[in-house]
C-alpha cells in the first residue's frame, strides 16, 4: 500500500472500517453463531407451551397449575436480561454469552428429570436466567460487527432464529412427544446449547468496539479485526470509536437515562412490553385454546408452530425495509397489522385452512415487529451503554411476557372463549403501534 494512505489508518475508526468493507466470511461466522444462540433460545422458550397438554395429562394436574411454571422461566428471563447487560458492558459480550448458553442448556436438561410442579418451577426459573441473558448480548455483539448499511437486515435475520426455534419446537414436539413423552423436548433443548457453548468459547470473538471503549489494548483489537481486512488493520497504530468523545457518563445507566436517551428508552420499553403481551399469550395458550375448541393435539401443535414460523418469513423483510425506510414507521405498521390479524383469527374458528393462514399472518406481523425491536435499540444506544440498553428493553419487556401468560390463564379461568381472547389482543397491538411511532418523533434515534 502506498505511503500516502498511512495517516488515514494510523488511528482507525472501528465502525467506519467495518462500514467500508464487504461482509467477510469471519463476520458471516459471527452471524451464524449468534443465529444459533437465538434459535436455541427460541426452542427452549417455547418448550413449556408445547409440552403443557402432555404434561398435565401425565401428572394428572389441571392447566392452571402450570401457570406459575409458565411464568417462572419468564421471571428468570427478566433477571437474566437486566443483570447481563451491565455485566456485558463491564466484562465483555463474549464471556456473558458463553455463560448464558451454558446455563440455559444445563438447567433445561435438568428440567427434563422433574417429578413435580415445584421442581419444574425452580428449574425453569434457572433456565430463564440463561435465556434472558443470551438474546440481548447476541444482538449487541452482532450489531457491533455489522456495517450500518446491513445492520437492521442482519440483526433481524438473526432474530428470526428465535421464531424458527419456537416453530421447530412445535414441529418437533408433534413428532417427539407422542413417541417419547414430554421429557424429550426438554432433553433436546438442553443438550444442543451445551454443545454450542463449547463452540462459542473457541470460535466467537469479543466485540472490537467494546475492546476499544474499555481500553483493552490495540493488540487485542487488531487480533479480532484482522480477519476482516488484514492489510488495513496491520497499518493501524491505534483504534477509536468517535462516540467516546460525545457520550460522557459515570455508568451505563446514566447513559441510557441521559437527556438524549431517556424518552426513547421508556418508549422502547413500552413498545416491546406490549408486543410480548401478545406473543406470550399466544405462545403459551394458543395450543391449549385450540385443544379446547376441538382440535387434535397434532393440529394444535402445528398451528401453534405456524404462529412462530410467520416470524421467520417476515424478519428478513422487516430488516430490509428498516435499512431503507423510516424504521419506526415500518415497525409500527407491523404492530398495527398484528392487531388486525389477531382479531381475524378470533373470527375464524372452525375453518381450519383459513384459521391456519390467519395465524401465520398474525405471526408474521407480531413476530416480525418484535424481531426488529432489538435492532432499533442497538442502533439507538452508544457502545458504552448498548448492551445495557438492549438488555433492559428485553428485560422490562419480559414483564409483558409474564403478563401475557398470566392474562391467558386468567381469561381461560374466567371462561372466555377463543374469539374473546383473540379480540382482546387488539389493545396491546394498538399501544405498541402508538409507542414506536411516538419514539420516532421524540427521540434522537436514527430514522433511516
UniProtKB/Swiss-Prot annotation:
Main location: membrane
Entry keywords, A to Z: Cell inner membrane, Cell membrane, Chemotaxis, Membrane, Transmembrane, Transmembrane helix, Transport
Subcellular location per the Swiss-Prot or TrEMBL entry: Cell inner membrane
Residues exposed to the Cytoplasmic side: 1-30, 89-94, 141-152, 206-261, 323-329, 373-398, 443-448
Molecular function GO labels: transmembrane transporter activity
This protein's GO CC annotations: plasma membrane
Keyword Acyltransferase attributed: no
InterPro entries: MFS, MFS_AAHS, MFS_dom, MFS_trans_sf, Sugar_transporter_CS
CDD domains in alphabetical order: MFS_PcaK_like
Transmembrane regions listed in the UniProt entry: 31-51, 68-88, 95-115, 120-140, 153-173, 185-205, 262-282, 302-322, 330-350, 352-372, 399-419, 422-442
Periplasmic topological domain: 52-67, 116-119, 174-184, 283-301, 351, 420-421
Assigned protein family: Belongs to the major facilitator superfamily. Aromatic acid:H(+) symporter (AAHS) (TC 2.A.1.15) family.
NCBIfam families reported for this sequence: 2A0115
Biological role: Transports 4-hydroxybenzoate (4-HBA) and protocatechuate across the membrane. Driven by the proton motive force. Also functions as a chemoreceptor, which is required for chemotaxis to aromatic acids.
Record protein name field: 4-hydroxybenzoate transporter PcaK
Originating species: Pseudomonas aeruginosa (strain ATCC 15692 / DSM 22644 / CIP 104116 / JCM 14847 / LMG 12228 / 1C / PRS 101 / PAO1)
The encoding gene: pcaK
Amino acid at each position: 500500500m502506498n505511503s500516502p494512505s498511512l495517516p488515514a489508518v494510523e488511528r482507525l475508526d472501528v465502525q467506519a472500517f467495518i462500514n467500508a468493507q464487504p461482509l467477510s466470511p469471519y463476520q458471516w461466522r459471527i452471524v451464524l453463531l449468534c443465529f444459533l444462540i437465538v434459535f436455541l433460545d427460541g426452542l427452549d422458550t417455547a418448550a413449556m407451551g408445547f409440552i403443557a397438554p402432555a404434561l398435565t395429562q401425565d401428572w394428572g394436574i389441571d392447566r392452571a397449575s402450570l401457570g406459575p411454571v409458565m411464568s417462572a422461566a419468564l421471571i428468570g428471563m427478566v433477571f437474566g436480561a437486566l443483570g447481563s447487560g451491565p455485566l456485558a458492558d463491564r466484562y465483555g459480550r463474549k464471556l456473558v454469552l458463553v455463560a448464558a448458553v451454558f446455563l440455559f442448556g444445563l438447567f433445561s436438561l435438568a428440567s427434563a428429570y422433574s417429578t413435580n410442579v415445584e421442581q419444574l418451577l425452580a428449574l425453569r426459573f434457572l433456565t430463564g436466567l440463561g435465556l434472558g441473558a443470551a438474546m440481548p448480548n447476541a444482538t449487541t455483539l452482532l450489531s457491533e460487527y455489522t456495517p450500518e448499511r446491513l445492520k437492521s437486515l442482519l440483526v433481524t435475520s438473526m432474530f428470526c432464529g428465535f421464531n424458527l426455534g419456537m416453530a421447530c419446537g412445535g414441529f418437533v414436539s408433534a413428532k417427539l412427544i407422542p413417541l417419547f413423552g414430554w421429557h424429550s423436548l426438554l432433553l433436546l433443548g438442553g443438550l444442543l446449547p451445551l454443545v454450542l457453548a463449547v463452540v462459542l468459547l473457541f470460535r466467537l470473538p469479543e466485540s472490537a468496539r467494546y475492546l476499544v471503549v474499555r481500553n483493552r489494548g490495540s493488540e487485542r483489537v487488531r487480533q479480532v479485526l484482522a480477519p476482516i481486512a488484514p492489510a488495513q488493520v496491520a497499518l493501524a497504530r491505534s483504534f477509536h470509536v468517535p462516540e467516546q468523545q460525545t457520550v460522557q457518563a459515570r455508568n451505563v445507566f446514566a447513559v441510557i437515562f441521559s437527556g438524549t436517551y431517556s424518552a426513547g428508552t421508556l418508549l422502547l420499553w413500552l413498545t416491546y412490553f406490549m408486543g410480548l403481551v401478545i406473543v406470550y399469550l399466544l405462545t403459551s395458550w394458543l395450543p391449549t385454546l385450540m385443544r379446547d375448541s376441538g382440535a387434535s393435539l397434532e393440529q394444535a401443535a402445528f398451528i401453534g408452530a405456524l404462529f412462530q414460523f410467520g416470524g421467520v418469513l417476515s424478519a428478513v423483510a422487516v430488516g430490509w425495509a428498516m435499512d431503507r425506510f423510516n424504521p419506526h414507521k415500518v415497525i409500527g405498521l407491523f404492530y398495527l397489522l398484528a392487531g388486525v390479524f389477531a382479531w381475524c383469527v378470533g373470527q375464524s374458528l372452525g375453518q381450519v385452512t383459513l384459521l391456519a393462514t390467519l395465524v401465520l399472518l398474525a405471526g408474521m406481523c407480531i413476530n416480525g415487529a418484535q424481531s426488529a425491536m432489538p435492532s432499533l435499540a442497538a442502533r439507538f444506544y452508544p457502545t458504552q451503554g448498548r448492551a445495557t440498553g438492549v438488555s433492559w428493553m428485553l428485560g422490562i419487556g419480559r414483564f409483558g411476557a409474564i403478563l401475557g401468560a398470566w392474562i391467558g390463564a386468567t381469561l381461560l379461568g374466567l371462561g372466555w372463549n377463543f374469539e374473546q381472547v383473540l379480540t382482546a389482543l387488539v389493545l396491546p397491538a394498538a399501544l405498541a403501534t402508538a409507542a414506536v411511532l411516538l419514539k420516532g418523533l421524540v427521540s434522537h434515534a436514527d430514522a433511516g
